[in-house]
Regions:
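Serine-hydrolase catalytic-loop signature spanning alpha/beta hydrolases and amidase-signature enzymes
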Residues: 82-84, 106, 136
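Bacterial Sec-dependent N-terminal signal peptides
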Residues: 1-21
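Short beta-strand element of the alpha/beta-hydrolase
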Residues: 71-80
């Protein structure tokens, strides 16, 4: 009976165990950043979304389409939040999973939000992260079976 329960538990949990690769945008020091403690916060809010703020270490999360469905296109998703927070669930991972189901390789960019405390020039920080994300996806396009000329950005 215990084996049966464990088996069923694993079967039902498998769809939720789709661990994604998370890639740091920069190796070493993040450009245009001040040396401060990482104070990133993530708050789950069932009424709104999962809210991420105070990002100082930007990352790129990879959502691959199912085998045989990939169509060679990619999208980098920049979750919204009015440059105050990132809505990382609804406008990030949920959107990425929907794109992946359509055969599009999706990436969620956790980017730095304008902040005088963490950036030397807050007017260019988010743009630097978006540009770096595009460079990474183009550079590793072959690894993910992406046509480097078919990479879009959303957000």
């Amino acid at each position: 009976m215990v084996k049966y329960f464990v088996f069923l538990s694993l079967v039902f949990l498998m769809p939720y165990c789709n661990a994604q690769q998370v890639i740091p945008l920069y190796q070493g020091k993040v450009p245009n950043s001040k040396s401060v403690t990482n104070e990133e916060q993530r708050v789950a809010n069932s009424d709104v979304d999962s809210l991420t703020s105070n990002v100082s270490v930007p990352t790129l999360s990879v959502y691959l389409p199912p085998k045989g469905l990939a169509n060679g296109t990619a999208v980098i998703i920049c979750p919204g939040g009015g440059y105050h927070v990132l809505l990382t669930k609804r406008e990030g991972s949920d959107a990425a999973r929907a794109f992946a189901k359509m055969g599009v390789t999706a990436f969620v960019l956790k980017y730095r939000l304008p902040n005088d405390k963490t950036m030397l020039d807050k007017s260019i920080g988010p743009l630097q992260d978006a540009q770096q994300a595009i460079k990474i996806v183009r550079h590793r396009a072959k690894e993910w079976s992406i046509d480097p000329k078919k990479i879009g950005i959303l957000g």
